[in-house]
Amino acid sequence: ELKRFKFVYKKGNLNQAASSVFCLYKHDELKNTVDNLFTDGTMVKLKDEYNSEEAINALEEKVNKHPLKHQLVSNIEIAKELLKEEKDFSDRTFTLTQYGNTHEKARNQLGMSRYGTDLQSTGIVGRPGQVFKVFVEAEDGAPLPQIVFSQQEGRFGHWKQEYQLKKGLNVITVPEIYNDSWSQKPIKGGPVYLMNRYTPQQQGKAPVVRIEGGEEFPLYNSGDDKAEFLEKLKAYKAKLDKDPANTVDVYEFNTTRFMYTGTAKAAYQVYVNEGVDVEESVQVWNTRIQDAFELSGLKDDPSDPTNDSTNVRTSIRLMQPYGAAYAASDHIGVQRHIQEIILRTDQDSINSILWGMMHEVGHQLDIATREWGEITNNMYSNNAYVNDGAGDRAAYSKIHNLLAPDDSSVNFNNLDGTIQLGMFWQLQLKKDTYWAELDSLYRKK
């Protein structure tokens, strides 16, 4: 039995050595046991020695007498639920990507002014006040992911809130992000995301996260089973019609180059009522953004890091009005009136928003050190227009009129935007690799 302590001070401050408080702790074997009931941090399977009602009941008796019962009882309750019935947690369990910080890569390595998102869709919507249980399995000592709660149709600069996760159980109450001052009045709540800005070299094995809480909404990842998705969309639309005051109107899809967050009502109208193929729909803007990457000389090739666009994506989402559309540092905001149009695949629908969509994408892709606001970003719009057969919006006749006089000394800054665009685009006409070579040089330098 311990009766005496001896403290030896090896270094003091100002030749004085002092101590304030010493706390003595007894090893808590019960807490250690309760913290290690499960095979891993997702808490979906009990270890063999605890996989029985007898074992858990015996532990529960001890926990009920423990001074820290309120901290230990949650694990006992989870264990009892697992013993009661076998559950399938696959739809709520996510193995996280380990792409590193692609937003930082887009900015620092590729020179883009705004492009890049690291949000990973869960297909779960959370509403303010709901309590989420988030279970995390990861290697000991590894950096851990975050969970991100969002507000559907939120405001620029105020639409999401991030929480750092720890290994094991995390209990988080969904925050309220909604603001009554907004012009559009969506239902409070929005999609829940996971964000893991680390690589295998930093983390070892990929973290696995399981989420309890919220409800599932229609999510389509390129290549998913289309029939299965449509059934989920129909069921969610029925719920939305039955209880619109308590159901967030949201639909989301993911492709190689971007994540889109819109409305379930628009998705139902286009995919169910109009019969548009969902895979063709999600590829419409993915293809055009990929074309913009290629115009800029980007390619998925890790062996060429200054031009490597592997895993670089953006987020395009329904947001509060801020002009017709806008490009922010972490998303492109669009408004309600084009929700159906974005999902349609006919050329008239595509052309009706083609310039504006690629104009905003161009803002994000534009290399900051050579960006000429509202001019160079339109290289991507014009490229899309030409590729889609919608014409070339460079004003060549105006350029010719300016060049015709012997004294042609109009300052570039005094020219209108179509002429300024033409000064760049004519070089692309001269050599179709001009823009790719120019951007590649900027990235290299």
Regions found by a protein language model. Name each.
Residues 7, 63, 134, 194, ...:
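Generic structural signal marking isolated hydrophobic packing positions
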Residues 19-22, 51, 58-222:
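Beta-strand-enriched, solvent-exposed domains that form extended recognition/catalytic surfaces
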